[in-house]
Design a protein with these regions (language model features):
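Conserved N-terminal segment of class I S-adenosyl-L-methionine
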Residues: 1-97, 108-115, 120, 152-153, ...
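A short acidic, helix-capping loop that chelates divalent metal ions and anchors anionic groups
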Residues: 79-81, 136-141
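Hydrophobic adenine-recognition pocket in adenosine-nucleotide-binding enzymes
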Residues: 101-104, 133
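A short His-aromatic
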Residues: 104-105, 148
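Conserved beta-strand signature within the Rossmann-like core of class I S-adenosyl-L-methionine
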Residues: 124-131
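Short, flexible active-site-adjacent loop segments at beta-strand->alpha-helix junctions, enriched
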Residues: 133-135, 173
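Acceptor-substrate binding/catalytic loop of class I
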Residues: 139-158
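C-terminal alpha-helical "lid/dimerization" subdomain adjacent to the S-adenosyl-L-methionine
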Residues: 145, 160-161, 166-177
Length: 209
């Protein structure tokens, strides 16, 4: 049974996202995830990282806000985590982030995951996630374990359907200073003409309503 119960609702939510961001170029450009984490994290909040791997973000986060409570989830039991199954979590968080995970799920699994994440957030809590930018020519296809390509409008739509609000998107691109400036100031016209983006990653944030 599909977790997406209404395809007409999905299409309507997609239109809502496209109204906010008509084209990929309407999405703001940032250098790296930490630019957003610095803005979203503050001392004293409870944080869950999903797909934590080696927990490398724990130290980075605690340099920003030493008093945060950080918990991690990953299905790889060869790594050290607080949780290995999201259904084992019986506490709530102010901020949950999930980088390069959702594309490894089917669209139905992604909807179930987003609804579960929404239930783990305190009211007003924030989810931040990333996924390969489909407007980049080859970013998504560089990993054989990817299951679902998410355009930003589709990702935003299922986030809305899962109970999130105030959806915002960011494109992420970092490079050598001169190459980055060339791409942003001059190369952008070529990229727009070809309808391909140089930003490799899309980040989405949403709040629990």
């Amino acid at each position: 049974m599909t977790a997406i119960s209404s395809w007409s609702e999905l299409f309507e939510k997609r239109k809502k996202i496209k109204t906010l961001y008509p084209e990929i170029w309407d999405i703001s450009l940032i250098k790296k995830e930490m630019d957003l984490l610095r803005r979203l994290i503050r001392d004293g909040i409870r944080i869950l990282e999903i797909g934590a791997g080696d927990r490398r973000y724990e130290d980075r986060i605690k340099k920003i806000a030493p008093m945060v409570i950080y918990k991690s989830l990953d299905i790889d039991r060869e790594t050290r985590q607080d949780y290995y199954d999201i259904d084992d979590i019986h506490e709530t968080f102010d901020f949950i982030f999930m980088f390069e995970v959702i594309e490894h799920l089917t669209k139905e699994e992604a909807m179930v995951m987003l609804k579960k994440i929404n239930s783990l957030l305190n009211q007003g809590g924030t989810l931040l996630l990333s996924t390969p930018n489909l407007y980049h020519p080859n970013r998504y296809y560089q990993d054989i374990t990817h299951k679902t390509p998410f355009r930003y409008e589709d990702l935003g739509a299922i986030m809305l359907m899962a109970g999130f609000d105030s959806i915002k998107f960011h494109r992420m691109y970092n490079d050598d200073f001169f190459r980055r400036m060339f791409r942003i100031a001059i190369g952008i016209y070529f990229h727009k003409y070809m309808e391909v983006d140089f930003a490799r990653t899309i980040l989405a944030e949403g709040k629990r309503i």
